[in-house]
Amino acid sequence: MKRHAILATIGSLVLAALTIHPAAAAQSPPAAPSLDFEYFKTRVQPIFAAKRPGHARCISCHIAGTPLRLQPFSSGGTTWNDDESRKNFEAMRRVVAPGNLKSRLLVHPLAEQAGGDFYHNGGKHWSSQNDPEWQILKAWVLGETKSGSE
């Protein structure tokens, strides 16, 4: 009987809280943005093949021997086909938390003084969050789409 009384009291308290603040019960956290494949394919993915002074291309290391694996170019190719792009997109989804600017894709290759972390054996490719390539990655993580909307 005592247990029943405790449960009834708890139920009454919950009901009272919902009555006092009904909007709080209906609110849920905002949904995280989704990652757009077309934006990835046309804006993000080319960054992985770009040459930067003093650094190897991302694809040089990330096709083998690292936890984050990109697809190699087809023999003689200089870019990825749709199937390879889809596989790269899926690999990148493992290092991106949509909507989170602390995603590994953003902080590992970013200089520590610019907000990056100490990880990334391939060096710090961007010294500032204002770098145009870093801004493209950020836009994608925040839900930018090829059509330009979020």
Question: How does the language model describe each region?
Answer:
Residues 23-150:
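Aromatic- and Gly/Pro-enriched helix-to-coil junctions and flexible linker segments
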Residues 1-4:
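Positively charged n-region of N-terminal signal peptides that target proteins for export
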Residues 8-19:
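Bacterial N-terminal signal peptides
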Residues 6-7, 142:
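General helical structural elements
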